[in-house]
UniProtKB/Swiss-Prot annotation:
This is NADH-quinone oxidoreductase subunit C/D. Coiled coil: none annotated. It comes from Pseudomonas putida (strain W619). NDH-1 is composed of 13 different subunits. Subunits NuoB, CD, E, F, and G constitute the peripheral sector of the complex. Its EC number is 7.1.1.-. Residues 208-593 are annotated as: NADH dehydrogenase I subunit D. In the N-terminal section; belongs to the complex I 30 kDa subunit family. In the C-terminal section; belongs to the complex I 49 kDa subunit family.
Length: 593
């Protein structure tokens, strides 16, 4: 993308109603039911008969909603706080994002239990494919016309739909598990790849195709990830990514944890992102509760989040270069990560999974001596990045393996839901820290690194430059750390300030209930997205006025990034796929949740 055709991104305006006016003008106001939420976007319910027409209109409107950011479902049957909403046993939501407008809109449709089907929208947004499969997998909602509606998170032999409210949430609610020989053989046979089921031929006009399983146990697959390759020699004719091996039911877990006790579970999504995982969750809960955190909390959160951006990118850099054949850099990047973890551990008490952010603040104040630790790191890392750039990134073999490999443009990136460095490597200047500042990022000076070829090499270079910008942000946190409390003065802050419990019996009772049962959040919906280490990560929370989330939707960046693989890599060599997989920068917990 050149400067001549770069997308202009206007200033962000929450709850932008311009699209609502356009929809009313096109379909009539009576076609929609507006829902008041704290999501920061218009939320409109439509009838199933008009769903596809409405979505097609939004896809083709001036400054279109080019990205289907998310698509998922909700079991509405046990929800009590639904005043003013259409009757529904289940609902499906379509979260659309327009970079050109810098705004979002959410379209919802209600379904009755005896008629759980919708038309597919894979012809409008290609990345709807996996999302619709997951909705069928988790809720049993059918999508007519879908090219391959099958399990995606659960094994093919699984029975039931886990995110339904009548599906057990605990293993103890099932019969004891036993693996008989017959069951083992059934599971093994179900994992066998059938090319015809995916529309693939075993033979061409003059050749036989070979089908190769890469993974789910392969070092270049970066986790429990299987991709089946249809090969003509070493050329990739087609491929089928197969995910779900790392699925742990994170969204189901959120329905049986209190708002506070779910925080450690967020750390396990992108397990390299540390407190970066906590941030969208606690910000979304704070929106529900109406909590405004002190400025010091914002700055502390940003500083720690940028530390984890650096540690994640260092791991990416080492393993990426290793994937294309150089062994030495990975040892250096792992050693350098330890310098960052020394600072992180001194501040939070933990390394990879601190679970350190809290509803309304952070776990505790900064320790004595934190300034020197941060200052030493800020002064040291830029020199190391210079060494990596000179010794590794300018290496002719690395360039030969990655320049021009697995390239795509901005239009393709948006259609597949690609965000983060993968999007900015195409020249699209969309970084939420700038485009939609949260947690005080608007108070910091930094640049958004861009590239223009959208290939494997550019994705690497963007992340290296992002580390330099993270150092700038951390340095500003160091120099401008505000005084004040590390926790908000709000009744729903969790855990509440200890000093309030030492007054009389009523404060002790309140403290006990809030810590043991958890805070009661107002009935509403909230949403928060952030620029995480691997792209845009978000939490969409539904509260029914209780101590636990009614529905927690976790949208992760790695999920659509893997879905994009076949469209990018067809016609390339197997060696190019290895370079491409490394350049994506994903972890399977971020994909499978």
């Amino acid at each position: 993308m050149t400067a001549d055709n770069a997308i202009f991104i206007p200033p962000y305006k929450a709850d932008d109603q311009d699209v609502v006016v356009e929809l009313h003008n096109r379909f009539g106001a009576e076609a929609f039911v507006a829902q008041e939420t704290r999501t920061g976007m218009p939320v409109l319910w439509v009838k199933r008969a008009q769903l596809k027409e409405v979505l097609s209109f939004l896809r083709g409107v001036s400054k279109p909603y080019s990205m289907l950011y998310d698509l998922h479902g909700v079991d509405e049957r046990l929800r009590t706080q639904r005043r003013g909403l259409p009757a529904a046993d289940f609902s499906v939501f379509y979260h659309l994002l327009s970079v050109e407008r810098n705004s979002d809109v959410m379209i919802k449709v209600s379904l009755s239990e005896g008629d759980l089907n919708l038309p597919t929208v894979t012809g409008i947004w290609p990345n709807a494919n996996w999302y619709e499969r997951e909705v069928w997998d988790m809720f049993g909602i059918d999508f007519a016309g879908h090219p391959h509606l099958s399990r995606i998170m659960m094994p093919p032999t699984w029975e039931g739909h886990p995110l339904r409210k009548d599906y057990p949430a605990r293993a103890t609610e099932f019969d004891p598990y036993s693996l008989t020989l017959a069951k083992q053989q059934l599971e093994e046979e179900s994992a066998r790849f059938n090319p015809e089921a995916w529309g693939m031929k075993r033979q061409g006009a003059n050749e036989d195709y070979m089908f190769l399983n890469l993974g789910p146990n392969h070092p270049s697959a970066h986790g429990a990830f299987r991709i089946v390759l249809q090969l003509d020699g070493e050329e990739i004719v087609d491929c089928v990514p197969d995910i779900g091996y790392h699925h742990r039911g994170a969204e189901k877990m959120a329905e049986r944890q209190s708002w506070h006790s779910f925080i450690p579970y967020t750390d396990r999504i992108d397990y390299l992102g540390g407190v970066m995982n906590n941030l969208p969750y606690v910000l979304a809960v704070e929106k529900l509760a109406g909590i405004q955190v002190p400025q010091k909390v914002d700055v502390i959160r940003i500083m720690l989040a940028e530390f984890f951006r650096i540690t994640s990118h260092l791991l990416f850099l080492g393993t990426y270069i290793q994937d294309v054949g150089a062994m030495t850099p990975v040892f250096f990047t792992f050693t350098d990560r330890q310098r960052a973890y020394t600072v992180i551990e001194a501040i939070t008490g933990f390394r990879l999974h601190p679970a350190w952010y809290r509803i309304g603040g952070v776990a505790h104040d900064l320790p004595r001596g934190w300034e020197k630790l941060v200052k030493d790191f800020v002064e040291w890392l830029p020199k190391r990045l210079d060494e990596y750039t000179k010794a590794a990134l300018q290496n002719s073999i690395l360039k030969g393996r990655t320049i021009g490999v697995a390239a795509y443009n901005t239009k393709e990136a948006l259609e597949w839901g690609t965000t983060g460095a993968g999007l900015r490597a195409t020249g699209c200047d969309f970084d939420l820290r700038k485009a939609r500042p949260y947690s005080g990022y608007e108070n910091f000076e930094f640049e958004v690194p861009l590239a223009h070829n959208g290939d494997a090499y550019d994705r690497c270079m963007v992340r290296v430059e992002e580390m330099r910008q993270s150092i700038r942000i951390i340095d500003q946190c160091l120099r401008n750390m505000p005084e004040g409390p590390y926790k908000a003065d709000h009744p729903l802050t969790t855990p509440p300030p200890k000093e309030r419990t030492l007054q009389h019996i009523e404060t002790l009772i309140t403290h006990f209930l809030q810590v043991s049962w958890g805070p009661v959040m107002p009935a509403n919906e909230s949403f928060q997205m952030i620029e995480a280490t691997k792209g845009i990560n978000s939490y969409y929370l539904t509260s029914d006025g209780g101590t636990m989330s009614y529905r927690t939707r976790i949208r992760t960046p790695s999920y659509p990034h893997l879905q994009q693989i076949p469209s990018v890599i067809k016609g390339s060599m197997v060696a190019d796929l290895i370079a491409y997989l490394g350049s994506i920068d994903f972890v399977m917990a971020d994909v499978d949740r």
